[in-house]
Amino acid sequence: SDVCSSDLPFVGLILAFLVMRLIVVIFRNKNPQKVGGGFRHAQSVSACAMAMGHGMQDAQKTMGVIFLLLISMGYASASDEMPVWIVFACAGAISIGTAVGGKRIMKTLGRGIIDLDPARGFSAESVSATVLYVTALGLDAPVSTTQVITGGILGAGVEKRVSSVRWGVGVNILWAWGLTLPAAAAIAALVYLIIKLVSGL
């Protein structure tokens, strides 16, 4: 695939901005309370779609790493089907991890970057879910769920006004993204060296 994952936050930002602008135009003269209540229900659907997209992207990456390990150890070949136990193990792990450790990240995304109202939450989630589905099913491209939804939230917030976005929080997120890859590589190398020393491989 020719998809560049670093571009996807900007894709999410632009699409969420456009979707939110369309929502504002359509519901401009409607009762704000009724509109908010309607989007609160709609957000239940968009949140479920987003959760499914999260599993389709992030769980599949973990499955791929485990399957690659099995191939390298001679327990499987590239032509084999993905073992069912890997699918269930990764699905369970990502579900438990999201439920147990995702609260702080959800708070940062839902309240830290902007104050999300139901309409903006729906816009960000629906756009992000669409991007995740298209990249996973149509382009076979692994992308970051967090990067896509962050771009969507920024786009929905910018549509209101640029000053409504807490850009300092966004900069902190960018720093975290930049540090993740080298930190993960360094830790993986360290673990490998320890295993090599202990096992004598």
Model-derived features with residue positions:
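Short, small-residue-biased leader/transition segments that mark boundaries at the very start
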Residues: 2-5
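Transmembrane alpha-helical segments of multi-pass membrane transport proteins and ion-pumping complexes
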Residues: 9-21, 25, 59, 63, ...
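Intrinsically disordered, low-complexity non-transmembrane regions of multi-pass membrane transporters
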Residues: 19-50, 78, 105, 111, ...
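Generic transmembrane alpha-helix signature in multi-pass membrane proteins
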Residues: 48-54, 60-68, 132-138, 144
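Transmembrane helical segments that form the transport core of multi-pass membrane transport proteins
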Residues: 57-124, 139, 156
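Hydrophobic alpha-helical bundle architecture
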Residues: 110-145, 173-178
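Catalytic phosphate/nucleotide-handling subdomain of diverse soluble enzymes
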Residues: 155-173
